[in-house]
Structures are given as C-alpha cells and as structure tokens.
C-alpha cells in the first residue's frame, strides 16, 4: 500500500507544482473530499462498487465538485483514483500528499517542549 499511496501522492504533487496551483488550497480541497467520503458510507459504496460503471461514479464526483467548488485538477485526480480502482486509498494518499507537499516546500514537523507554559504572544 505504501508504494500506491506515495506514487499517487507524488504524481498529484507534480500536478500542483507544474500547474502552479496553491498547495495549501489544493491540500485543503483534497482533505475535504477525503473527509466527505469518510463520512458517507453510501458514497464509498458507490465509488467502490465494481458493478457501477465508472461514468456514473465520475458523474457523482462531478456533482460533488460542482456543489463544493473544488478545482478541476482535484476533480481529475479523484477521477483517476476511481478509474484505477484506488479510491479506497484516498485518505492515506491525501496524508502522503500532505507530506510530499511539505517536503517540496521545505517544511518539517517539529515538536516543541517548554519548561513552562507559554503565553499567546510567545
């Protein structure tokens, strides 16, 4: 699974940088789609059902994207996951996508420990 998630995450990060999209906005949209899907059993059942044609799955995706106002590159990315039957990996792909964006932007996660409680200005 790790190679699947990293492959798709890197590919989508390539799109973000090649098309000069706003990484933060694109990540937020991707997280929103993942949260929406995670919160809807019915949506998952449709997207994962092999008996439902991909065209119908993409039509449902288009309705969601249109209603939420998500970008076309995000729509296309999710459509690729649907078409390649990788939609079940959406959540870990989005998490890996976040790590990939952070890596490319030079961000690193840090844990800060203080001997005393810090105030808001600090």
Q: What residues fall within each predicted segment?
A:
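Elongated, mostly alpha-helical coiled-coil "stalk/stator" tethers of large membrane protein machines
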Residues: 1-122
């Amino acid at each position: 699974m790790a190679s699947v998630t990293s492959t798709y995450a890197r590919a989508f990060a390539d799109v973000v940088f090649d098309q000069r999209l706003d990484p933060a906005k694109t990540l937020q949209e991707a997280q929103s789609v993942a949260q929406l899907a995670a919160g809807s059993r019915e949506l998952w059942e449709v997207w994962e059902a092999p008996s439902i044609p991909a065209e119908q799955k993409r039509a449902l995706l288009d309705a969601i994207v249109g209603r939420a106002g998500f970008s076309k590159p995000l729509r296309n990315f999710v459509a690729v996951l649907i078409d390649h039957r990788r939609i079940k990996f959406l959540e870990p792909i989005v998490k890996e996508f976040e790590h990939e964006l952070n890596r490319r932007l030079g961000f690193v996660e840090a844990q800060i420990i203080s001997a005393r409680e810090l105030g808001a200005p600090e």
